[in-house]
């Protein structure tokens, strides 16, 4: 915060609460107010009245950063220097111990058709069923690459994946999942053999995980109930 200096005792404990996305936007249903403006937030108002308020721009004025970048900045890191993507945070949160050379990804369980076109980017916001689906991927092996796949469920439709092996590169363009886009539209960001290999590894993982998930009993049951199957990662 510009112009604000707070001196804390070394022994002082701090509880940092980040209302990630809480500000939201004005809604017609709320008479042009944001959910926070319309809420009965007397406890928050009291805390604010007892403390000091300020304005903090994580990446500069007018820039709305993602959660990961914003939290890095709040904790005192320069995202422009240290940010490498969200996957590493997700892997750490899933208790995956990463090694040098590993690639980490934040993943969604999704619904695709047989040509890998995305139908639902969150598989109907699947919940605890995703735990069993993630377990079914624990023994997944890639036929054409000596690359280990570590996959863990994290929360709801979300998961974390780590690829471990030689000759992998982070220089791969992975677009955020969108409905009616192809799930396998990965592209190398440079002409290196490592980037091209990583693209092919990701495509093989996508197809291999689809082959496991599409016939999983949970997905057969979901389809029978008219729910979107979580048949892809």
Language-model features, listed with the residues they occupy:
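A general structural signal for short secondary-structure junctions and capping/turn motifs
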Residues: 7, 44-48, 99-101, 150-153, ...
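Beta-strand elements within well-structured catalytic alpha/beta cores of enzymes
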Residues: 13-25, 46-47, 205, 221-224, ...
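Short, Lys/Arg-enriched N-terminal segments with co-localized hydrophobic residues
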Residues: 1-11
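Active-site nucleophile/metal-coordination loop of metallo-enzymes that catalyze phosphate/sulfate
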Residues: 13, 23-141
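Short hydrophobic "helix-edge" motifs at membrane interfaces and signal-peptide entry regions
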Residues: 9-11, 146, 215-217
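Long, well-ordered, tryptophan-enriched scaffold segments
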Residues: 200, 210, 214-221, 225-228, ...
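Structural beta-strand/beta-sheet cores of well-ordered domains, especially the beta-sheet scaffolds
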Residues: 13-15, 54, 105, 157-159, ...
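A contiguous, mid-domain pocket- or channel-lining segment that forms the substrate-recognition surface
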Residues: 86-213
């Amino acid at each position: 915060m510009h112009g604000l200096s707070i001196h804390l005792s070394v022994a002082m404990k701090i509880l940092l609460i980040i209302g990630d996305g809480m500000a939201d936007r004005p809604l017609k249903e709320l008479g042009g107010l944001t959910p926070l403006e319309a809420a009965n937030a007397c406890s928050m108002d009291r805390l604010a009245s007892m403390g000091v308020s300020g304005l903090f721009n994580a990446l500069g004025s007018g820039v709305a950063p993602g959660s990961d970048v914003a939290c890095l900045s709040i904790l005192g890191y320069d995202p422009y220097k240290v940010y490498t993507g969200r996957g590493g945070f997700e892997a750490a949160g899933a208790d995956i111990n990463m090694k040098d050379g590993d690639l980490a990804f934040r993943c969604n369980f999704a619904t695709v058709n047989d040509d890998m076109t995305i139908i639902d980017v969150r598989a109907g916001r699947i919940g605890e069923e995703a735990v069993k689906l993630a377990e079914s991927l624990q023994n997944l092996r890639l036929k054409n690459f000596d690359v280990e796949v570590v996959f863990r469920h994290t929360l709801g439709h979300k998961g974390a994946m780590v690829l471990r092996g030689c000759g992998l590169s982070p220089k791969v363009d992975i677009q955020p999942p969108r409905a009616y886009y192809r799930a396998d539209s990965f592209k190398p960001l440079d002409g290196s053999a490592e980037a091209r290999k990583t693209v092919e590894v990701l495509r093989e993982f996508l197809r291999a995980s689809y082959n496991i998930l599409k016939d999983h009993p949970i997905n057969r049951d979901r389809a029978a109930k008219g729910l979107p199957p979580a048949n892809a990662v």
